[in-house]
């Protein structure tokens, strides 16, 4: 089956920050970028041809679970992306990045159309993110990312999202998981009520 070619000039990828050894001038030029390219079934050169930016321009160090992230800088740089980029589709890599664009409490793989653009909230590609430990999550992420980058919409009946929590979070925060489901169902209702 012939698949639509990925038009790199219409795509933007936004990450958190460069890795400890990463070059701040080359967003997603390391292992995380290679993982995204592999999942998207695009060459690394095609990935580099897309618009790319880190919301924090320098590695900020470590915290308990993953890297530190400066939300104030992230918010400013997210606003710059919205004002400066002329792309149709933007992949937001991780929950911190999604929050800087104003998307809170949405699951991974949620697609949002707003500001005349489409956004995909994609799991952070690093190995620290346990979401990637389940094969079905990776399979679903790969399928959705490929469709999104080609400009296709998710067909009806295709699961749009899965669990965004790790096992330890799920067992310790049952109430939070229920709130997430409520957010998703409210969002679906509002789409259908618009007509």
Predicted features along the sequence, with ranges:
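A polyanion-binding, active-site-adjacent surface
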Residues: 1-110, 114-131, 135-155
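Charged phosphate-binding loop/patch that engages nucleotide di/tri-phosphates or the phosphate backbone
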Residues: 130-175, 181-195
């Amino acid at each position: 089956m012939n698949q639509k070619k990925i038009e790199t000039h219409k795509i933007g990828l936004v990450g958190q920050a460069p890795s400890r050894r990463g070059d701040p001038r080359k967003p997603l030029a390391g292992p995380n970028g290679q993982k995204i390219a592999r999942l998207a079934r695009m060459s690394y050169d095609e990935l580099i041809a897309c618009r790319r930016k880190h919301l924090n321009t320098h590695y900020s160090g470590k915290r308990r679970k993953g890297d530190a992230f400066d939300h104030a800088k992230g918010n400013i740089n997210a606003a710059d992306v919205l004002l400066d980029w002329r792309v149709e589709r933007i992949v937001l890599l991780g929950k911190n990045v999604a929050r800087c664009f104003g998307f809170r409490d949405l699951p991974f793989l949620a697609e949002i159309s707003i500001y005349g653009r489409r956004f995909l909230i994609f799991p952070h590609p690093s190995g620290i993110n346990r979401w990637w430990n389940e094969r079905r999550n990776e399979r679903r992420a790969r399928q959705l990312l490929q469709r999104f980058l080609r400009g296709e919409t998710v067909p009806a009946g295709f699961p749009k999202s899965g669990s965004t929590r790790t096992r330890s979070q799920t067992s310790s925060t049952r109430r939070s998981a229920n709130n997430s489901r409520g957010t998703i169902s409210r969002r679906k209702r509002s789409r259908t009520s618009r007509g």
